[in-house]
Amino acid sequence: MATALATMTAPVRFDFQNNNVEVMTLDTLRRTHKENDIYGNPVKGIYHYEVIERMTDICKKYNLNYEVEEIFAAQNKNKAQPGVVVLPQVEEKYGENAVEAHVLRRVYATIRIKNWETDELTTTLVVAFHQDGIQAAIGPCVLVCHNQCILSPERSVSNYGKDKVTTEELFGRVDGWLSNFEEQMNEDRERIRRLKEKKISAVEMYAYIGLLTALRVSHDSSDKRFSSKVETYPLNQSQISVFTEDLLKLAEEKQTLTAWDVYNCATELYKPGKTDLPAMIPQNGALAEVLLSDRLN
């Protein structure tokens, strides 16, 4: 028992000097430094670990079989408000790079819901906590590669941006998803079936690559006629290059491509360390919208 206790309470250290992303447990996240305002309250009104706890409470409310699967924290290049800050005065107490000395402003967590899980798919509730605010989304997750699917605009919510809600309304939206879990899960799996049945010719494959490029260019254009039409692009330019190469390789290996293959090539990029945390959820949803619609017609 003493050995087990020693292991559980052993100090944990982060190394964001060499790692852009660190993985941790919920207990470790709770131990990180709490960022408060001048009144001693959480800067975002709620701590990152409390957001995850609220999500798990909703899972419990509906007797769902869940586990907090992965928690990531990421650094970013924002010098004014970096994703990770190390406090030297706290290091003096706990040691160099101690967990307790870290302020984590960019956290991404996945909560796996195992009800009606298959050999191919589970369902994941994802949470992003960062400098802009809080995001949540739900959808199927491909077990073999951990590729997250967000297959409808109704499956994501945030407390900032164009369609922002309050933090409590965000939790209310999640409650709505989980209260109708089986029905919404079946709707998403039907969308996957449609993607799998949608054959993609070589011409269509190149058309999708061109469309994704056009959406990116339009979004970033200084011409409002174009930028006003694209709120979120599915892939940025560097991602389009990686996606295109991966898709071309897949086309060499498979006789027939489907829209599901195209989607999975892109969702491989929507992971911490590959996509900026605040962009992971909206880009994923934007891509599904393109593939499930008839944008090429």
Residue map of PLM features:
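Intrinsically disordered, low-complexity regions enriched in serine/threonine
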Residues: 1-14, 88-297
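Feature for intrinsically disordered/low-complexity regulatory segments and propeptides
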Residues: 1-53, 62-63, 67, 72-76, ...
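A short acidic/basic microdomain associated with nuclease active sites
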Residues: 60-103
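Compact, well-ordered interaction domains used in eukaryotic information-processing assemblies
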Residues: 56-57
